[in-house]
């Protein structure tokens, strides 16, 4: 019984006329990738401006009159040199965005701005806002998006259409034949007389809005399929009046009755020629500099530039002398210059003192100067002693002691010094008439410095290398920090310094090798004495010995760890041999 009732119910449902099922269109969130065509774009029944968020731009549009919701797809247009995807007319909406259908299919990231025939809408200029004019019953084409942001020319018989990535903010300027730029106060005159105004520049603004002219063009006879010729279409004008204080956008629609239309056939369409003149929004200076070089050559450009501001004190600025480049050494204070340096033993760092008794650390291998103590020198106990004992103060103290010794000399020497001082003051009392005449002529040049002969300078430089302990086994760059602050360093130029350094290294390397060998022998003897005094047994290890006697000065004389272990192992072998010999003797005695 239940099965029969179900079958009867199913037959009744099949006999009833079924209503056509319409696929509910899905809204496209504009922050996501676009779906595959065809697209349906819901717009209200009145004209207005749509303000979109950054990066959102509609596809190319086709202006059409009212059509029913169930209108079929338009077939491919003959003579259209583009892929043959069809055009899908949009569903007409009755009124403004208050309608329920608009809320049902919202345009995300958009805000509708509407008004009467000539509303004044105040908009704050912003680089993240795009203004798109929308008109009732607009059909987006499913043509492939244009490459680049260049204008693509789509032609039909006796007709021309410009498509672009609409209102994409860019710093390029396209100049089609229909481009017109005018002020907002010229709009009324333009609409009344239908005369194209002359090109004029708007008043400069910090961030102007784009100025766009949209004009509907009639399609002459010879259109195909459902496209019919139209005598005149409505003229739509959008202008942007720029000013320093604020910017406003004007939209006006001048409707006229369309003539020559037949109600029996499909409602005619007419195309819209889009000719924007875009003023770029610059968020930062020189932001588009890199793009200009990478762009290919384009059609003639229209450049709008604000007039340069002339300063009121321009004459004074012209009279001012040009700036003079001065070396950092001349501008730096004398107290900031380095006075002396001392290398820290066992590390690549050296301590440098300045004239104002400040201390910084310099690494010549890395060419690095640091005011704070480096990590390598954090646990050095001798660093404080080095900082507290600067070498330049030692010299001052030594000179002060010498002067004090000289002051305790006999009275005769004091009388002689007084006489010499008197003679100096008498000779320097005042210049004679000839001297005053020379002084009046101009500033005297300082007397030329007498240079020592080259041989003496070379000997002084060699003495400096010996005194500073420059190693013959090192390089010029590593040893530079030892000699760069010595006044004798400046006796030679850079080429002569390096030549003498190379000669010094060649002659010095043999002597230094002998010195190193003798030092190593002395250190070895001292190390053996330490081993003998420590009473090491053959079973003790080097680690135990180093922990116990590592702070001894004789242990530190041998600097390399390998040498220390080698000497220790040699001593242990000698001890083992002695033990064996002693055991053999004891066995023989038994």
Curated annotation (Swiss-Prot):
Q: Biased-composition ranges for Low complexity? A: 14-25
Among SMART domains, the record links this protein to: FF (SM00441), WW (SM00456)
Highest taxon, organism lineage: Eukaryota
Q: Which UniProt keywords apply?
A: Repeat
Claim: Repeat is one of the keywords in the record? yes
Record's compositionally biased regions (Basic and acidic residues): 306-332, 382-391
UniProt domain FF: residue ranges: 454-507, 519-574
Q: Which InterPro entries match?
A: FF_domain, FF_domain_sf, TCRG1-like, WW_dom, WW_dom_sf
- Gene Ontology molecular functions: RNA polymerase binding
Q: Where is this region: Disordered?
A: 1-29, 285-344, 382-450
Task: Report the residue ranges that make up the WW domain in this protein.
Answer: 145-178, 343-376
Q: Does the keyword Repeat apply?
A: yes
State the Pfam families in the record.
FF, WW_TCERG1
The name this protein goes by in its record? Transcription elongation regulator 1-like protein
